[in-house]
Amino acid sequence: MSNKDIRVVVGMSGGVDSSVTAHVLKDQGYDVIGIFMKNWDDTDENGVCTATEDYNDVIAVCNQIGIPYYAVNFEQEYWDKVFTYFLDEYKKGRTPNPDVMCNKEIKFKAFLEHALKLGADYVATGHYARIRRHDDGHVEMLRGVDNNKDQTYFLNQLSQQQLSKVMFPIGDIDKKEVRKIAEEQDLATAKKKDSTGICFIGERNFKTFLSQYLPAQSGEMRTLNGDKMGMHSGLMYYTIGQRHGLGIGGDGDPWFVVGKNLEDNILYVEQGFHHDALYSDYLIASDFSFVNPVDLDNGFECTAKFRYRQKDTKVFVQRESQNALRVTFDEPVRAITPGQAVVFYDEEVCLGGATIDDVFKTTGQLSYVV
């Protein structure tokens, strides 16, 4: 089968990465369709939402490269599957990663299902990741060539079935080359800056945005010894290891968030970047997903990331229970945060990931959320 007989539906955001993705596929002779996903009702609140501007950029790019385009509305799916999860996690005192859930439920589920109805053989996105396809039909997900832009961390929940239908055309090149291609082709998005906001919601004042959906309750900031250091403006606004926004003056080392007490609405803080309370030895995680089978019963060694762009840490992964994993670190790790993803790697291969629930020292539970 030649490329012209293979239909690829591209998820286009109005950014330079998805624009170049569509161009590369078109240039390679594929039957390409561009789809813009509208997943957030920008009339819901007063934040600056760029959906209209982004769609106009999609139209301009699709016209430039000569492919058909459509807009599809997934607002209900996004609200039900991603945003309610996002809010529920904050209510629990955790720090969620909406991009992970957005990829799992929207970009590679709702969008993939829609694309298949359009006769797609594959979907493609502008993610910095790679797919390795084997002769027996199974696939592996690899880190993007541009290590600084690699996005496998956010794609860790994708299944073998999903990835078998996915292409990541720019995963083999770095960001500078993507910009260069966009400029050489004079694409409308060539000089557009990268978005850094919440998946599909955009860039806005996070504190103001969150307060529109969750009522904030101020409370005391205390040290682990019980000394009162001030007041916090709502536990949901703080994350483990946070330094800024605490409002604690005085001499000496900076202060950092080391824990939350949900029941008594207390934010725990301690002084010093390397305070012992910020370090842990192992974690328990749930909602785990692996691209290919792994030996959880006997356990296995690999490396892991606990946040995006973090250096890999050597770990040992084993089954804790039917629905949970225990991940033990080779050396103590700082500021691991419940609600975030732990993502596993075997060199360049992304094995999968899970959601961090509880974090422990060897001597007992670390009181990040109590």
From Swiss-Prot:
The active site is at C102, C199. Residues 97-99 are annotated as: Interaction with target base in tRNA. It is found in: Cytoplasm. It is an enzyme of class 2 (transferase). Residues 149-151, 307-308 are annotated as: Interaction with tRNA. It catalyses: S-sulfanyl-L-cysteinyl-[protein] + uridine(34) in tRNA + AH2 + ATP = 2-thiouridine(34) in tRNA + L-cysteinyl-[protein] + A + AMP + diphosphate + H(+). Coiled coil: none annotated. Disulfide bonds join C102-C199. Keywords: ATP-binding, Cytoplasm, Disulfide bond, Nucleotide-binding, RNA-binding, Transferase, tRNA processing, tRNA-binding. Its EC number is 2.8.1.13. Belongs to the MnmA/TRMU family. This is tRNA-specific 2-thiouridylase MnmA.
